[in-house]
């Protein structure tokens, strides 16, 4: 039953309708574009979290977050990750966050205690969530 429900979740892809583009990562100016207007030469540095995305997160029972959705270290490109962090913090879901950049974003935008579980491990965190046995855990007898 669980794998059937999980399969249904994986079939659904929610994409942003607007993205933030700029000439370079060091640019102080940016432009918001509809996703359909993005050209091959545009450099996307952030996305706008849609109300649909926020609603799905707010109604989720579990949220797994791995990786920021924009270049959150730079002012014009941090809005998407900031919105994501605030939405997760405001959710009643059990939330898991993994990866050094994700934890840095959490520390920048919200209180770490607003996330149920944080791990600085990125790839290892995801592998563990997949049920893979990690060498370090195995060495400890786990």
Model regions: which residues?
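Single conserved hydrophobic/aromatic residue that forms the stacking wall/gate
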Residues: 1-6, 10
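A short helix->loop->beta-strand "cap" motif at the edges of active sites that frequently abuts
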Residues: 11, 90-94
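Active-site rim loops that border cofactor/substrate pockets in soluble metabolic enzymes
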Residues: 11-76
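Charged helix-capping and loop-helix junction motifs
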Residues: 77-86
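C-terminal functional extensions of proteins
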Residues: 100-142
């Amino acid at each position: 039953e669980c794998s059937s429900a999980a399969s249904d979740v994986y079939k659904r892809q929610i994409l942003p309708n607007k993205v933030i583009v700029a000439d370079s990562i060091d640019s102080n100016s940016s432009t918001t574009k509809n996703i359909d207007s993005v050209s091959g030469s545009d450099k996307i540095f952030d996305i706008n979290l849609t109300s649909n995305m926020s609603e799905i997160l707010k109604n989720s029972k579990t949220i797994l977050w791995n990786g920021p959705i924009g270049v959150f270290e730079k002012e014009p490109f941090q809005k998407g990750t900031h919105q994501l962090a605030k939405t997760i913090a405001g959710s009643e879901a059990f939330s898991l966050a993994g990866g050094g950049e994700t934890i840095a974003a959490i520390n920048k935008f919200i209180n770490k205690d607003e996330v149920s579980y944080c791990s600085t491990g990125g790839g290892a965190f995801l592998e563990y969530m997949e049920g893979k046995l990690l060498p370090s855990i195995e060495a400890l007898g786990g």
